[in-house]
């Protein structure tokens, strides 16, 4: 399985957000989680790449296996989890640096640590990633522009493009179109 949780429970302080979640997702499948607002979908996704642990008041019991490895085992390095499990959030979160540097940021970080990353010159990596999200033609002449100056749709596409050079095995998308105008989802889905 690509993802398998076993008896996963999570608390924010004294509030229990997840209760004994057992879920298995096979590799290679596109899977959707559907449920009412506040039922724990985002909390579960954030548990799969350990973003919840940034908050000092989160406690987790149970296990989450990604590609058959318990990502909460003490020997598992966070940087390797984030390389395997990319995430796109509800609101775009480009780094406040250039469009070009946004694409190359995680590639540089993960290339140093070994493992599979996109090959090629930095310019080739940037172009390929932006072409894959249909953003290249729009930004190719302004790659030094600050990423935060792009429209919301463009920022969200950039956030997806930023993951591609790292070649994550799993891509989590937490309602990536919810903050966009009505035409935005179509552009991101393309």
Explain the meaning of each model-derived region.
Residues 63-80, 144:
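ABC ATPase NBD Q-loop/coupling interface
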Residues 66-70, 119-141, 190:
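Conserved ABC ATPase "signature" region
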Residues 160:
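Hydrophobic anchor residue at the start of the ABC signature
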Residues 146-150, 154:
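Conserved ABC ATPase signature
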Residues 171-174:
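Catalytic Walker B motif of ABC-type/P-loop ATPase nucleotide-binding domains
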Residues 167:
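Conserved catalytic motifs of ABC-family nucleotide-binding domains
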């Amino acid at each position: 399985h690509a993802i398998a949780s076993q008896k996963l429970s999570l608390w924010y302080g004294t509030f229990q957000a997840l209760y004994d979640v057992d879920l298995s997702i096979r590799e290679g499948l596109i899977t959707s989680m559907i449920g009412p607002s506040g039922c724990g979908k985002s909390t579960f996704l954030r548990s799969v790449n350990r973003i919840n642990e940034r908050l000092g008041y989160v406690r987790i019991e149970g296990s989450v296996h990604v590609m058959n490895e318990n990502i909460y085992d003490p020997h598992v390095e966070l940087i390797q989890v984030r390389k395997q499990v990319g995430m796109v959030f509800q609101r775009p979160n480009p780094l406040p640096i250039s469009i070009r540097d946004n694409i190359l940021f995680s590639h540089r970080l993960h290339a140093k640590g070994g493992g599979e990353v996109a090959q090629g010159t930095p310019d080739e990596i940037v172009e390929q990633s932006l072409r894959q999200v249909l953003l290249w033609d729009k930004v190719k002449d302004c790659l030094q522009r600050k990423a935060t100056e792009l429209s919301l749709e463009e920022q969200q596409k950039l956030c997806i493009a930023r993951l591609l050079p790292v070649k994550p095995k799993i891509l989590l998308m937490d309602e990536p179109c919810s903050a966009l105008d009505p035409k935005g989802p179509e552009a991101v889905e393309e």
